[in-house]
């Protein structure tokens, strides 16, 4: 027999998890579906030990700590959770309800909240001969466990916030960290750059990796070419950590039987987080509206906005408390 829900949240990153918590507060029958085998989205999957600074009241929380805190918060007002389950289709029925299909089961829901971020993500690869064969060994795209780099020489490639954060995170465990960027200036927050300037990290700019070779002791020599010059220099390291950003793809949405208005691959929403399809809301990095800022903190504001407004639509005669202090928790 199909399960019937008031709300189905698709995506178990920070915004989706906070939305699930709010469903529990409003005593809505809700399910949270996540394609990965664990909750937490990109912070938990990509940088569990990296510190996140843009969450109010959580100064320097790691990606995994943030996911754990959100999971504990959901337990205050639990909802059904289905992990390792990819939604293959969402169909709007004639009565306005939705049928949600996955490879494992089928369920129905009165409303949908899409919290899938930018969809499946993959790192931009180091385009050098031999780099692919070294993936997971000398060449890495993630620093999930900084102890993997203990007492090693590490070259971090990239010049944005994420690259600098990775370099700073490894500074206290690595023997030496090098930051290689093709420009003289870094594209990062001023505070982050100030931390870099005060660190022991050796900045190599403006250089671009030209080739790499594996040495007899399994270290790697990166040959760096200076931009707009003939100068080259070798750099011998134990690990190369590439941080050129990620490509993302919400192709799964295109397979669903929902005609969602979008802009450059992101879902258009109004001030209540409604999409162009009645009964479907969207929150997080995968949505667009005027003035949108793609931060975890922004998603935390969008989640209660979406849940409170859809709750009013589902139960217009029910008085909806807005503040948790009015909901009898604790």
UniProtKB/Swiss-Prot annotation:
<protein>
    <recommendedName>
        <fullName>Ferredoxin--NADP reductase</fullName>
        <ecNumber>1.18.1.2</ecNumber>
    </recommendedName>
</protein>
<dbReference type="InterPro" id="IPR023753">
    <property type="entry name" value="FAD/NAD-binding_dom"/>
</dbReference>
<dbReference type="GO" id="GO:0050660">
    <property type="term" value="F:flavin adenine dinucleotide binding"/>
</dbReference>
<feature type="binding site">
    <location>
        <position position="34"/>
    </location>
    <ligand>
        <name>FAD</name>
    </ligand>
</feature>
<keyword id="KW-0285">Flavoprotein</keyword>
<keyword id="KW-0521">NADP</keyword>
<dbReference type="GO" id="GO:0050661">
    <property type="term" value="F:NADP binding"/>
</dbReference>
<feature type="binding site">
    <location>
        <position position="87"/>
    </location>
    <ligand>
        <name>FAD</name>
    </ligand>
</feature>
<feature type="binding site">
    <location>
        <position position="47"/>
    </location>
    <ligand>
        <name>FAD</name>
    </ligand>
</feature>
<keyword id="KW-0274">FAD</keyword>
<feature type="binding site">
    <location>
        <position position="42"/>
    </location>
    <ligand>
        <name>FAD</name>
    </ligand>
</feature>
<dbReference type="Pfam" id="PF07992">
    <property type="entry name" value="Pyr_redox_2"/>
</dbReference>
<feature type="binding site">
    <location>
        <position position="325"/>
    </location>
    <ligand>
        <name>FAD</name>
    </ligand>
</feature>
<comment type="subunit">
    <text>Homodimer.</text>
</comment>
<dbReference type="InterPro" id="IPR022890">
    <property type="entry name" value="Fd--NADP_Rdtase_type_2"/>
</dbReference>
<feature type="binding site">
    <location>
        <position position="285"/>
    </location>
    <ligand>
        <name>FAD</name>
    </ligand>
</feature>
<dbReference type="InterPro" id="IPR050097">
    <property type="entry name" value="Ferredoxin-NADP_redctase_2"/>
</dbReference>
<dbReference type="InterPro" id="IPR036188">
    <property type="entry name" value="FAD/NAD-bd_sf"/>
</dbReference>
<comment type="similarity">
    <text>Belongs to the ferredoxin--NADP reductase type 2 family.</text>
</comment>
<dbReference type="GO" id="GO:0004324">
    <property type="term" value="F:ferredoxin-NADP+ reductase activity"/>
</dbReference>
<keyword id="KW-0560">Oxidoreductase</keyword>
<feature type="binding site">
    <location>
        <position position="121"/>
    </location>
    <ligand>
        <name>FAD</name>
    </ligand>
</feature>
